[in-house]
């Protein structure tokens, strides 16, 4: 065995180790308490659907919850059946879809390397071509270790659930568009996958699941100054039908069950009004996502910025440096890949920058495109020396190690102040496991999951907001003078404990909220 072969074997072992580390890190620490307003709500919706054996109608507190489609809930329901109703199960589908996003990008890299090898007539791998065959690994590694993907793949929310099928659909389209094979299978299967995953995207987060892929493809053709071929144009007929058939698994029975109520709540209120207004109180400046998206590429931000600088230089100066010309050898499809990634990145950026409602996760479907540009630059960077390759692999591993340290030693501390789980556990251990739970001067979304079945609600299913101790007293009287648990912000705790209307015993607090056992005096 020569030195070159030994070096390649050693390199493959390193890549295998990093792949296993990626899988480990994406499932590690998913059992921390649910955080924020969304995770506990979505996890509870799935639990209620599972308890009713209802795969169609989402509910929260028994009331219809028509904000989002079903895919996340289905993933959580299946996970609950396998792992039980736990935080890990609630997040398992998100982690799986995070890995699916990474794998889709790896497939893209493999396709580019294979096409490049074919075009150059190179059927065997040689030492100087190694960086090209490794491009798929670099693309996957950079995606896996980006802070945006690491963070959102750990949350029981819809953003990563949308990002994977959009990534899979666009990768499928690019393979169709660039494939040199003319066989029926090679030309049609990627198109079938493109439209199938559009259907899955519709199940993931609604209309955006079809708007983004088609708009990105259209913008790509515009940037590339070319017309789509007949095969793609004709595919719009049968392909759109395929996408709608996949989406109909949920949309059709939902409409049959709820009619205009579903259309108004889901499409009008949570699609059009959410986009065109600030009804849901998430305002941000126009440039918000132009800052958020680059930050999601950390720790690869310098490479992303360098890639963008090179791209701008090439666009506006119509020339390439000698170094860039040499780097062009990475792939014969490099310019078309860059054009496609640019279209992929700009469409969501432009779309959501005009939205009246802005949250960081909205821009996640654009992150894979940013990572393609980043990985393209980084793969060229490591061609200069073996030391650079080792340095970047080490950076990715250190990022994984940093995540483990944060989850092990810091996240639980932060979660303690953000969750009511420990408060309710403490109260239950004191003999109040059957007591109703009220919220005074707050509506804790976290309690939706951890206080399930015990929260006070209005007739329409919405949580009741209590403004004073008198309302607590009134509820106790209506509840047969049984003691209740009250979640109250610490700044209002004295109002409860010093009241002449009720007797309150503070059982625990998390630094933000306290839980008290309350009865009549």
Segments (PLM) and residue ranges:
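Membrane-integral, polyisoprenol-dependent glycosyltransferases
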Residues: 1-2, 9-322, 326-384, 410, ...
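Membrane-interfacial segments at transmembrane helix termini in multi-pass membrane proteins
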Residues: 378-392, 399-400, 418
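Short periplasmic/luminal acceptor-recognition loop of GT-C membrane glycosyltransferases, typified by
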Residues: 400-496, 501-513
């Amino acid at each position: 065995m020569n030195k070159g072969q030994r070096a390649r074997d050693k390199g493959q072992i390193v890549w295998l180790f990093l792949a296993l580390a990626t899988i480990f890190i994406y499932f590690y620490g998913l059992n921390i308490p649910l955080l924020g307003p969304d995770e506990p709500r979505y996890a509870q919706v799935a639990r209620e659907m599972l308890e009713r054996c209802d795969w169609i109608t989402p509910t929260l507190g028994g009331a219809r919850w028509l904000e989002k489609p079903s895919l996340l809930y289905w993933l959580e329901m299946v996970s609950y059946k396998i792992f039980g109703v736990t935080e890990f199960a609630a997040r398992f589908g998100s982690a799986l879809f995070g890995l699916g996003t990474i794998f889709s990008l790896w497939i893209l890299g493999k396709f580019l390397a294979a096409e490049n090898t074919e075009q150059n007539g190179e059927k065997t791998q040689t030492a100087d071509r190694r960086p090209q065959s490794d491009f798929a690994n670099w693309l996957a590694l950079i995606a896996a270790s980006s802070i945006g993907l690491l963070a959102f793949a750990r949350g029981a929310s819809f953003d990563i659930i949308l990002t994977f099928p959009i990534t899979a659909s666009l990768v499928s389209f690019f393979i169709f568009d660039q494939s040199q094979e003319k066989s029926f299978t090679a030309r049609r299967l990627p198109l079938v996958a493109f439209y199938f995953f559009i259907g899955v995207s519709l199940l993931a987060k609604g209309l955006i699941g079809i708007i983004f892929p088609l708009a990105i493809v259209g913008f790509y053709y515009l940037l590339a100054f070319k017309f789509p071929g007949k095969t793609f144009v004709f595919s719009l007929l049968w392909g759109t039908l395929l996408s709608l058939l996949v989406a109909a698994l949920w949309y059709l029975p939902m409409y049959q069950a709820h009619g205009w109520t579903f259309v108004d709540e889901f499409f009008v209120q949570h699609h059009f009004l959410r986009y065109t207004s600030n009804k849901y109180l998430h305002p941000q400046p126009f440039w918000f996502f132009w800052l958020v998206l680059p930050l999601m590429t950390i720790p690869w931000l310098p490479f992303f910025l360098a890639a963008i600088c090179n791209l701008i230089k090439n666009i506006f100066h119509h020339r390439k440096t000698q170094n860039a010309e040499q780097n062009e050898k990475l792939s014969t499809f490099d310019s078309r890949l860059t054009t496609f990634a640019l279209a992929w990145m700009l469409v969501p950026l432009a779309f959501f920058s005009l939205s009246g409602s802005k949250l960081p996760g909205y821009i996640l479907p654009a992150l894979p495109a940013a990572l393609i540009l980043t990985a393209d630059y980084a793969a060229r960077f490591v061609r200069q020396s073996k030391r650079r390759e080792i340095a970047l692999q080490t950076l990715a591993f250190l990022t994984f190690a940093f995540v483990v340290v944060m989850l092990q030693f810091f996240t639980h501390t932060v979660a303690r102040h953000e969750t009511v789980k420990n408060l309710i556990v403490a109260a239950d251990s004191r003999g109040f496991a059957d007591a109703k739970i009220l919220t005074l001067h707050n509506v804790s979304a976290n309690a939706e999951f951890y206080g399930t079945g015990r929260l006070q609600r209005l007739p329409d299913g919405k949580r009741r907001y209590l403004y004073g101790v008198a309302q607590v007293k009134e509820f106790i009287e209506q509840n047969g003078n049984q003691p209740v648990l009250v979640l109250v912000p610490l700044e209002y705790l004295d109002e409860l404990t010093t009241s002449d209307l009720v007797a309150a015993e503070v059982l625990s607090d998390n630094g933000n909220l306290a839980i008290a056992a309350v009865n009549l005096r």
